[in-house]
Amino acid sequence: MGIIRFQILNPTRICRSTIYYMSCRYLPSSSSSSSPLRVSSSSSQKPSFDFSRRWHFGHPDHHQQYQKPGEEGEKIFRLGLTADIGLSVAKALTGYLCGSTAIIADAAHSVSDVVLSGVALVSYRAANVPKDKEHPYGHGKFETLGALGISAMLLATGSGIAWHALDLLSIALSAAPEVIHSGHHHGIDMNHPILALTVTIASISIKEGLYWITKRAGEKQGSGLMMANAWHHRSDAISSLVALVGVGGSILGVNFLDPLAGLVVSTMIVNAGLKTGHQSILELVDAAIPAQQLEPIRQTILQVEGVKGCHRLRGRRAGSSLYLDVHIVVDPFSSVSVAHEVGEYVRRQINLNHPEVSEVFIHIDPAFLQFSCSTKDHDSITKESNICQEIKHVEATVSDIFSSQLSEKLTIKRITPHLLHSKILLQIVVAMPSTMSIQDVMIAAEHAEKEILKAAPNVARVSIQLSLNSE
C-alpha cells in the first residue's frame, strides 16, 4: 500500500521523514512490505533525522554520573575549611605577638573565611539533596540565603576594621614628626619580624594553592559555587599580600603603612560583602541570567537536528544550580511523538554539555510557513473564538462535503488539522473504489479542495492524499 499526494504541503521532505522515522521505530521489519509508512518513506531523499542512535542518553543515568564528583567537591570544601581555621589561628597569634594591625585585620578576614567556608560546605551539601515534596524545585535557595548572611557579616567585619585602622592611621600621622626627630619608631619588635613575614608568606602560598585546586575542581564539575570559592581564595591571597606590605613598612619604621594596609584590607572585605550580597539578592528575586552567559546553551540547542530555531531562552539561579526555560521551533508537520523526542534530545544535550543546569523546561513551537491566502475570507482565527470548536466545525464541514458530493468517488479515512500562524491547514487521507481511475480521483480531489475552501473560510490550505491500503 502507499500514499499518493495530490497536493504537497510544505515542507515535503520533513513530512516524509516523519513517517519514515515512526515506521523504523515502531514497526517490525517483517511487516515493512505491507506497511503504508514504508511505501511513503521510499523517497529518494534520504532522511537525516535519526533518533535510534540517541536514545541511550537516559535521564536517570545522567544524574548517576555526577554523584561521585559531588563527593569530590565536598572534600575540596573541607580542605578549604581546614586551611582557613589553621590560618586564622596562626595570623591571630602572629598579629598579637608582633603588634601588627595589618596581620590582625587579615586574621579577622580569615575568621570570616572560616564561617564562609563552613556555610559553603553546608550549602553545597544542602544543594545536592534530592528534590522532595516540600522542595520540588530543589534546595538551591538555601545556598543563596547562606551567602546573603555571609555578606552581611563581611560588611560588619570590614567596617569595624576600617574604623580601627583609621583611628590608628590618624595617630600614626600625628606622631610622625616626633618619630622622625627622635629617631625612634613603634614598629615591630625586631625579635618577631621573621615570624610575621613567614606567616604572611605562608598564607599567600596556601591561599593561592587552594585557588588552583578549587578552580580545577570547579571547572571539572561545572560548579559555580566552587568557582566563586576559588576566586575568594585568591582574594584572600591578595589581602595577605597587602598585609605583607604593612609588615614591611613597620619593620622599616614607616608607621602609617601598617594601619594603611589594614584599611586597604577592610576595603576589600567590604567590597566582597557588597558583591556577594548583591548577587544573593538577585538570585532571591529570580533575576534573569545575562544573555551572554546563556549564549553557549543557545548554541547547544541550535546544533540539535530537528530544531529550526529557539527563542525566549531565559534562566535563573538558585545557588550553584541553573534553571532554564526555552521555546524551540520544530517542523510543523511532525507528529507529536517526534516533536516530543526532539525536545527530550535537546534536554539531554543541555544536561550533557552544561552540568550546571539542574532543570530545563522546554516548550515546543511549530515553524511558521510563509503562505498567502487567495481571498480575504481566509483571515486568521479571532482570539475570542474557541480553536477546538473551530476545528470540529471544519471537520464536520469536510465530512458533509464528501458525503453529499463525493460519496461514490472518495471516502475519508483520516483528517489531520494543523494550526499554523492562526491558520487551519488540512491533511485529508481518502480511499477510492477499485474501478475508479487515478485521473478521475485527481479531478474529484480538486473539486473537494475548492468546496472546502469555499465552505470553511478559516481553512487556508488543503492537502488531499490517496491511500492505497485495502483495509
From Swiss-Prot:
Keyword Transport in annotation: yes
Recorded GO MF terms: monoatomic cation transmembrane transporter activity
Domain of life: Eukaryota
Membrane topology, as annotated: Multi-pass membrane protein
Subcellular location: Vacuole membrane
Any one GO cellular component localisation term in the record: vacuolar membrane
Keywords linked to the UniProt accession: Membrane, Transmembrane, Transmembrane helix, Transport, Vacuole
Recorded family membership: Belongs to the cation diffusion facilitator (CDF) transporter (TC 2.A.4) family.
General function of this protein: Involved in sequestration of excess metal in the cytoplasm into vacuoles to maintain metal homeostasis.
Name used for this protein in its record: Metal tolerance protein C1
Native source organism of the sequence: Arabidopsis thaliana (Mouse-ear cress)
